C-alpha cells in the first residue's frame, strides 16, 4: 500500500526524472554535452517495475577516444593548478552536491532500486568524500626528506596523468565520488565510465562538474557497455591508470586489456565476507549488525557479511532471533520511506540470485526464511530476505558472491575452526568479529585473510583509513594518502653536497 511519504517521493522523483527522459542521456566530453540526434541508444530500465526511465546514448570507440584525448589535453593545465585552487574547486563541488541532495537521492533510488532511507545519505557521503580530499589537495605533492651522507635526497609526488574511473551499479553516486575526488585532488584528469545499468547519477555528477569551475576536459563521462567503451578506456594509450569498483571477472579483463600499455590498476572487487559471532558476543548488537550488513542496500554491497559463522553453543538461540528479525523487514518500493529492502538492479541479476534457492536445496541446505519473490511485488525484481541454514562451507551458497539479500549460516565450535572457515574462500575483502574477548579479537585480526576487519561493529568507514581487499577481492587501497599512492607517481631527487667526490676513470 502506498504511504503519504511514498506518494510524495514518487511525485518529486517523477519531476526530476522527466528532465532526464525528455531527450536521450548523453556523454560529457571536453566540457560539452554531446549531440544525441541519430545516435544509437539503449533503454534504461528501473528495477521496481521494470519500466523505462528513458534512453541513453550507447557510446562508441570514437566517443571514448574523444574523451581520453580531452583528458590528455586538459592534464597539463589541471596538474599545474595549485593545490589551494584545487581545494577551492573541490569544496565548491561539494557545495553543489549538497544543493541537489534531494534530487540525487530520489534519482539514485529510482535508477538502482536502493531504498530512499539509505539513498538520503548519498549526497552527504559524496560531499564528504570531496571535502576530505579537497582539504588534502594542498599537501598531495608532499614527499619525504631522506638522509644520506654527502647527498640530500627528497621525494616529489606528481599526478600520474589522465585516469579512467569505472564504477558499478550499486550505490553508484557515492562510489563514483569516492574514486573521482582523490584523482582530481591529486591533479589527474578523469574519464568516467559508469555502469550502463544505473547511468543517471553519473549524469548528475557531470552536470555538477559544469558549474564547479573545472577547465574543459578535466571531467569527462561516456555512457555505454564495457565490451566497447570500457575496453577502449582500458586500452587507450593516453590513460595512465584504471580504477574499478566491480566484479572480480571484470577486474581480470581490465588487467588484460591494460597490459599492452602497462596501465596501473586499482581493483575493488567482490567478496564473500564472514561475520564471526562467538558465544560471548553482545547478543543484541551482534544481531543488529548481522541483519544490517546483509539486508540493507538489498544485499548489493561489496562488504556485505554474506556468511554468518555462528558458534554452535549460541547457534540455536541466535538463528531463532535472526529468523524473527528477517520476518519483520519491510520489502517495498525504493521511494517508500518505510522500505528497508528494495528491488535488485535488473531482471538478469534477479534471476541469478533466485537460482541459488534451488542450488541451496539441491546441496542439502534449508531455506529458513525468504527464498521467494513477494507476490504483491511481482512486477519488480524483489527477493524476500533469505537465510540458508544447515549449510557447510563447501556449498556454492557459501563460496560464491550472490550479491543479494541472502545469508548463509554455518556453525563452528572452536576459534581455530572459525578461522579456517573464514579463510576458506577465494575472496578476502572484509570480515567482522563479534566477541568480548580482546585477546581473541587481536588473534583473529592477525589470522583472518581480509583487507579490512571490524570488531564489534558494522562496516564503519573512516576516510583516512585504507579500503581494499586481498586474494580475489582486489588490488590496492583507497582512502587518505593510500589513494594518492595510486593516482600519483613518486620521484626521487638526489642533490650532491660539495663534500661528495665523483669517481674518476679514464683520467
What are these regions (language model features)?
Residues 1-48, 372:
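Hydrophobic face of amphipathic alpha-helices that form TPR/SEL1-like repeat modules
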Residues 52-59, 74-80, 164-165, 275-278, ...:
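Short, well-ordered beta-strand elements within core beta-sheets of diverse protein domains
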Residues 51-55, 239, 276, 330, ...:
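Conserved C-terminal structural/oligomerization subdomain of aldehyde/semialdehyde dehydrogenase
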Residues 142-285, 412:
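Rossmann-like NAD(P) dinucleotide-binding subdomain of oxidoreductase/dehydrogenase enzymes
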Residues 50, 86, 108, 130, ...:
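Residue-level signal for inorganic ion chemistry
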Residues 241, 249-392, 455, 502-506:
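ALDH superfamily catalytic-core signature
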Residues 51-140, 150:
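Glycine-rich loop-to-alpha-helix module at the N-terminal edge of alpha/beta enzyme cores
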Residues 75, 79, 94-101, 105, ...:
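Structural signal for hydrophobic packing residues in well-ordered secondary-structure cores
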Amino acid at each position: 500500500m502506498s504511504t503519504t511519504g511514498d506518494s510524495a517521493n514518487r511525485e518529486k522523483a517523477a519531476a526530476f526524472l522527466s528532465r532526464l527522459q525528455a531527450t536521450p542521456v548523453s556523454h560529457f566530453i571536453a566540457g560539452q554535452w554531446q549531440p544525441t540526434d541519430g545516435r544509437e541508444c539503449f533503454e534504461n530500465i528501473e528495477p521496481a517495475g521494470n519500466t523505462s526511465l528513458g534512453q541513453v546514448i550507447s557510446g562508441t570507440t570514437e566517443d571514448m577516444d574523444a574523451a581520453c584525448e580531452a583528458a590528455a589535453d586538459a592534464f597539463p593545465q589541471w596538474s599545474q593548478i595549485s593545490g589551494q585552487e584545487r581545494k577551492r574547486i573541490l569544496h565548491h563541488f561539494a557545495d553543489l552536491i549538497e544543493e541537489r541532495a534531494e534530487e540525487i537521492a530520489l534519482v539514485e533510488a529510482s535508477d538502482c532500486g536502493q531504498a530512499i532511507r539509505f539513498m538520503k545519505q548519498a549526497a552527504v557521503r559524496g560531499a564528504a568524500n570531496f571535502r576530505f580530499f579537497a582539504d588534502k589537495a594542498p599537501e598531495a605533492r608532499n614527499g619525504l626528506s631522506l638522509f644520506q651522507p654527502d647527498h640530500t635526497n627528497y621525494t616529489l609526488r606528481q599526478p600520474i596523468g589522465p585516469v579512467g574511473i569505472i564504477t558499478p551499479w550499486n550505490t553508484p553516486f557515492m562510489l563514483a565520488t569516492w574514486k573521482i575526488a582523490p584523482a582530481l585532488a591529486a591533479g589527474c584528469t578523469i574519464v568516467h565510465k559508469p555502469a550502463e545499468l544505473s547511468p543517471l547519477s553519473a549524469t548528475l555528477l557531470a552536470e555538477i562538474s559544469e558549474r564547479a569551475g573545472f577547465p574543459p576536459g578535466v571531467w569527462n563521462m561516456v555512457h555505454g557497455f564495457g565490451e566497447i567503451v570500457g575496453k577502449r578506456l582500458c586500452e587507450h594509450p593516453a590513460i595512465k591508470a584504471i580504477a574499478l569498483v566491480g566484479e572480480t571477472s571484470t577486474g581480470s579483463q581490465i588487467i588484460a586489456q591494460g597490459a599492452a600499455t602497462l596501465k596501473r590498476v586499482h581493483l575493488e572487487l567482490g567478496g564473500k565476507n564472514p561475520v564471526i559471532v562467538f558465544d560471548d558476543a553482545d547478543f543484541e548488537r551482534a544481531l543488529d549488525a548481522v541483519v544490517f550488513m546483509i539486508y540493507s542496500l538489498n544485499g548489493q554491497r561489496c562488504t556485505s557479511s554474506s556468511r554468518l559463522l555462528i558458534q554452535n553453543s549460541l547457534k540455536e538461540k541466535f538463528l531463532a532471533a535472526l529468523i524473527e528479525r528477517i520476518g519483520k523487514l519491510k520489502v517495498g518500493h525504493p521511494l517508500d520511506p518505510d522500505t528497508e529492502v528494495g528491488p535488485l538492479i535488473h531482471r538478469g541479476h534477479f534471476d541469478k540470485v533466485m537460482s541459488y534457492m534451488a542450488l541451496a536445496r539441491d546441496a542439502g541446505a534449508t531455506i529458513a526464511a525468504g527464498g521467494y519473490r513477494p507476490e504483491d511485488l511481482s512486477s519488480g525484481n524483489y527477493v524476500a530476505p533469505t537465510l540458508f541454514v544447515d549449510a557447510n562451507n563447501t556449498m556454492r551458497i557459501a563460496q560464491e558472491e550472490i550479491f543479494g539479500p541472502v545469508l548463509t549460516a554455518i556453525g563452528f565450535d572452536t576459534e581455530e575452526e572459525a578461522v579456517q572457515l573464514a579463510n576458506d574462500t577465494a575472496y578476502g575483502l572484509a570480515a567482522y568479529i563479534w566477541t568480548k574477548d580482546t585477546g581473541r579479537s587481536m588473534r583473529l585480526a592477525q589470522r583472518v585473510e581480509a583487507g579490512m576487519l571490524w570488531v564489534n561493529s558494522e562496516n564503519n568507514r573512516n576516510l583516512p583509513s585504507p579500503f581494499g581487499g586481498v586474494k580475489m577481492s582486489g588490488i590496492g587501497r583507497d582512502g587518505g594518502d593510500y589513494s594518492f599512492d595510486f593516482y600519483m607517481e613518486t620521484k626521487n631527487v638526489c642533490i650532491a653536497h660539495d663534500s661528495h667526490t665523483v669517481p674518476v676513470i679514464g683520467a
